[in-house]
């Protein structure tokens, strides 16, 4: 069967703040890109559903915040930047850890606290890191000043790199975010502030938490755009637009991605006490990011349903194998508790004794 090489799609116009014009309202998707995006988004979705299952079996313990429903955000952002650019986010970090290049098995093994995990089983759900990905961060909003620091480093070192600094609609009300806006604007830092607005901060809807829910205007003197966070192409085009702005030396930009999480805030939240099952169902049936991409591809002869089903089978197998690894891999031994605290073995002595000898550095 002859497939089309690419297709052009109309995408939702972004609302803008302090800008003459926003990102384009059309996007070209090649067949190759479409298949890649589909596979990555489907992998994130299945990985999160597997994490849900392992949590309910008490194999994953502690904090666990799932990303299903928001796959268009991590995929679209990654598609709009370079691998050498930087990303930092809050604790809903599994999707970004994957799009930044880590294999599923290392992510699931981190969730189960095993040696093969990306942080050697010591970080868990909220503390995963990859190349140029500065992780999940457990404190609400605390990653935003860090992201501005990364952008400062990019500028200071005269690198043509930018930092995507993510936070949620709940964290948007944190004072430190406004302090970070000010510094980024003052020093014209290459930072894109990205508010993933999934409508609820824990159990509080945006209307109950914010006097103004136009998060993209919150930067006041920083230009902002409001983006459909359920459409991977919309997110990609907006990211390219914001990245070009930041790279040109004009300073920061704010992006609000309007998205939705299918799970509760964390695994301890069933997610239905402050919103109705019907609301979740409606989003799933009308604006699911994976369904939207799939329909576009099938209806525009970029892929066949059979081909996408084959990808689904591949993804499921990859997730099953990863889960197998994450449950069979050994836990780190107790004596490694103090390892990896210092990047190099500390040489200094206190009162003639080296207290740190037991905290070896690299494994």
From Swiss-Prot:
What residues bear N6-acetyllysine in this entry?
A: 36, 217, 240, 286, 294, 309
Where does it mainly reside?
mitochondrion
The family database entries (SUPFAM superfamilies) matched by this protein are listed as: Thiamin diphosphate-binding fold (THDP-binding)
In terms of Gene3D superfamilies, this protein maps to: 3.40.50.970
Q: Where is the transit peptide?
A: 1-2
PTM entry text: Phosphorylation at Ser-205, Ser-266 and Ser-273 by PDK family kinases inactivates the enzyme; for this phosphorylation at a single site is sufficient. Phosphorylation at Ser-266 interferes with access to active site, and thereby inactivates the enzyme. Dephosphorylation at all three sites, i.e. at Ser-205, Ser-266 and Ser-273, is required for reactivation.
Q: Which cysteines are joined by disulfide bonds?
A: none
In-chain residues carrying the UniProt-annotated modification Phosphoserine: 205, 266, 268, 273
* Keyword entries, A-Z: Acetylation, Carbohydrate metabolism, Glucose metabolism, Magnesium, Metal-binding, Mitochondrion, Oxidoreductase, Phosphoprotein, Pyruvate, Thiamine pyrophosphate, Transit peptide, Tricarboxylic acid cycle
Q: How is its activity regulated?
A: Pyruvate dehydrogenase activity is inhibited by phosphorylation of PDHA1; it is reactivated by dephosphorylation.
Protein location: Mitochondrion matrix
Listed binding positions for Mg(2+) are 169, 198, 200
| Residues that hold thiamine diphosphate according to the record | 91-92, 138, 140, 169-171, 198, 265
Residues annotated as binding pyruvate are 65, 91-92, 130, 138, 140, 169-171, 198, 200
Q: Choose any GO biological process term that the UniProt entry carries and state it.
A: pyruvate decarboxylation to acetyl-CoA
List, alphabetically, the Pfam families matched.
Answer: E1_dh
Name any cofactors this protein relies on.
thiamine diphosphate; Mg(2+)
Q: One GO CC annotation, please?
A: pyruvate dehydrogenase complex
EC numbers? 1.2.4.1
Q: Which InterPro entries match?
A: DH_E1, PDH_E1_Alpha_Subunit, Pyrv_DH_E1_asu_subgrp-y, THDP-binding
Q: Which residues carry this modification: N6-succinyllysine?
A: 36, 217, 250, 286, 358
The reactions it catalyses are:
N(6)-[(R)-lipoyl]-L-lysyl-[protein] + pyruvate + H(+) = N(6)-[(R)-S(8)-acetyldihydrolipoyl]-L-lysyl-[protein] + CO2
Q: What does this protein do?
A: The pyruvate dehydrogenase complex catalyzes the overall conversion of pyruvate to acetyl-CoA and CO(2), and thereby links the glycolytic pathway to the tricarboxylic cycle.
Subunit-level organization: Heterotetramer of two PDHA1 and two PDHB subunits. The heterotetramer interacts with DLAT, and is part of the multimeric pyruvate dehydrogenase complex that contains multiple copies of pyruvate dehydrogenase (E1), dihydrolipoamide acetyltransferase (DLAT, E2) and lipoamide dehydrogenase (DLD, E3). These subunits are bound to an inner core composed of about 48 DLAT and 12 PDHX molecules.
Protein name per the record: Pyruvate dehydrogenase E1 component subunit alpha, mitochondrial
- Organism of derivation: Sminthopsis macroura
The organism's taxonomic lineage, starting at the top: Eukaryota, Metazoa, Chordata, Craniata, Vertebrata
